[in-house]
């Protein structure tokens, strides 16, 4: 294999603790408890090793990263090592004192999530009463601090009708960028798929709404749009390709090529407590497993898109078929594409209740998926 370029970004999942209980959370079903989280000095070492490896962007996430009192200290170290710093937050713990500490540390950017523009529905989705007013205050604090305001709305069948109002609210808050992200069905999102998966008609209306707003707000607000795979003909690239541009560190120190990768139960992921980042990136077997194109089965191997979508998502392939090697079922050419079609067909007219993201609330698997025959 040719020389491995360093990862552009590192996602530091500082904790799985979070005041919210969103049913589409990308955290694993088995949430890691506070007692096994990396200590401050371990995260500081990771900041140093990331800089030496060539990482340019340091993203702090969770759970809710502001649960960690050492967050400003970690940001300051990343800034000292000349990495761009970004926090991905619910905003419910961001007050004046924390904002002052973050600015003193040198934070570059904060991405603020919203569950809906409708207060009652937003707080039903997030499972936290009073959250919306705290989020609005957080947006104001970010703007007053002089930072660019990026908002994230996760959309699904139970809030999609409010998309026009979400975009209006984003503009009113002074957002320079808004991400409209359809739920990605991994982890808790997969558990809640029937409660979240929109109809094709809902998706088409949402897509048209985004396209109209992009044209109308050109030069005012950038709108990113992430579509669901279930109505796609081609898969999305896995983080720009498995272990090509991105590395994720879990709260306990597992190093992952993407935030959902530990769902791949057949792979053993290294710990930063035992490996250096450089050794993980260049030599860990789990990182080599799906890097590049040599691993690809047909039809990926001979497809002219093989270095565009990189075979799609390994986590989705495994979650839906029990086979992590198979072409992503999102691809119309995948032997497992019917699994996607069947999921859409099975979608009920009435959304079931959410299974909320919290420790001890994950459903117990009642069957083991068998690989889909080619």
Curated annotation (Swiss-Prot):
InterPro entries in the record: 4Fe4S-binding_SPASM_dom, Aldolase_TIM, Elp3/MiaA/NifB-like_rSAM, MoaA_NifB_PqqE_Fe-S-bd_CS, PQQ_synth_PqqE_bac, PqqE-like, Radical_SAM_PqqE_MftC-like, rSAM
Enzyme Commission number(s) from the entry: 1.21.98.4
PROSITE patterns: MOAA_NIFB_PQQE (PS01305), RADICAL_SAM (PS51918)
Subunit structure: Interacts with PqqD. The interaction is necessary for activity of PqqE.
Record-linked Pfam families: Fer4_12, Radical_SAM, SPASM
Entry keyword set: 4Fe-4S, Iron, Iron-sulfur, Metal-binding, Oxidoreductase, PQQ biosynthesis, S-adenosyl-L-methionine
First-level EC class: oxidoreductase
Cited SMART domains: Elp3
Cofactor detail note: Binds 1 [4Fe-4S] cluster. The cluster is coordinated with 3 cysteines and an exchangeable S-adenosyl-L-methionine.
Recorded superkingdom: Bacteria
Pathway(s): Cofactor biosynthesis; pyrroloquinoline quinone biosynthesis
Name of the protein in question: PqqA peptide cyclase
Catalytic activity: [PQQ precursor protein] + S-adenosyl-L-methionine = E-Y cross-linked-[PQQ precursor protein] + 5'-deoxyadenosine + L-methionine + H(+)
Family to which this protein belongs: Belongs to the radical SAM superfamily. PqqE family.
Record GO terms (molecular function): 4 iron, 4 sulfur cluster binding; cyclase activity; iron ion binding; oxidoreductase activity; S-adenosyl-L-methionine binding
């Amino acid at each position: 294999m040719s020389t491995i370029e360093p990862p552009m970004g590192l996602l530091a999942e500082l904790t799985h603790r979070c005041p919210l209980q969103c049913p589409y959370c990308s955290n694993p079903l088995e949430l890691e408890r506070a007692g096994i989280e990396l200590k401050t000095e371990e995260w500081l070492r990771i900041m140093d090793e990331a800089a030496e490896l060539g990482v340019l962007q340091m993203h702090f996430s969770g759970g809710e990263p502001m649960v960690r009192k050492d967050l400003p200290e970690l940001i300051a170290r990343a800034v000292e090592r000349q990495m761009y710093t970004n926090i991905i937050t619910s905003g419910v713990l961001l007050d004046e004192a924390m904002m002052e500490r973050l600015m003193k540390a040198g934070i570059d950017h904060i991405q603020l999530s919203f569950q809906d523009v409708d207060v009652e529905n937003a707080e039903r989705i997030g499972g936290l009463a009073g959250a919306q007013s705290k989020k609005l205050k957080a947006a104001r604090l970010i703007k007053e601090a002089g930072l660019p305001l990026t908002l994230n709305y996760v959309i699904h069948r139970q809030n999609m009708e409010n998309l026009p109002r979400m975009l209006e609210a984003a503009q009113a808050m002074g957002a320079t960028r808004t991400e409209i992200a359809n739920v990605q069905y991994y982890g808790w999102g997969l558990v809640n798929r029937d409660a979240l998966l929109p109809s094709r008609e809902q998706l088409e209306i949402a897509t048209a709404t985004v396209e109209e707003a992009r044209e109308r707000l050109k030069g005012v607000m950038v709108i990113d749009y992430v579509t669901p795979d279930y109505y796609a003909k081609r898969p999305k690239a896995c983080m720009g390709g498995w272990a090509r541009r991105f590395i994720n560190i879990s709260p306990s120190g597992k190093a992952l090529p993407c935030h959902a990768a530990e769902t791949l139960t057949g792979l053993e992921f290294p710990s930063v407590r035992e490996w250096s980042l450089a050794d993980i990136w260049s030599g860990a077997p789990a990182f080599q497993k799906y890097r590049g194109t040599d691993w690809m089965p047909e039809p990926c191997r001979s497809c002219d898109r093989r270095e565009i979508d990189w075979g799609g998502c390994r986590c989705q392939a495994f979650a839906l078929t029990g086979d992590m090697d198979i072409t992503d079922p999102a691809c119309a050419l995948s032997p497992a594409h019917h699994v996607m079609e069947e999921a859409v067909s099975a979608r009920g007219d009435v959304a079931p209740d959410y299974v909320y993201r919290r420790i001890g609330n994950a459903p117990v698997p009642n069957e083991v998926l068998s690989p889909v025959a080619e």
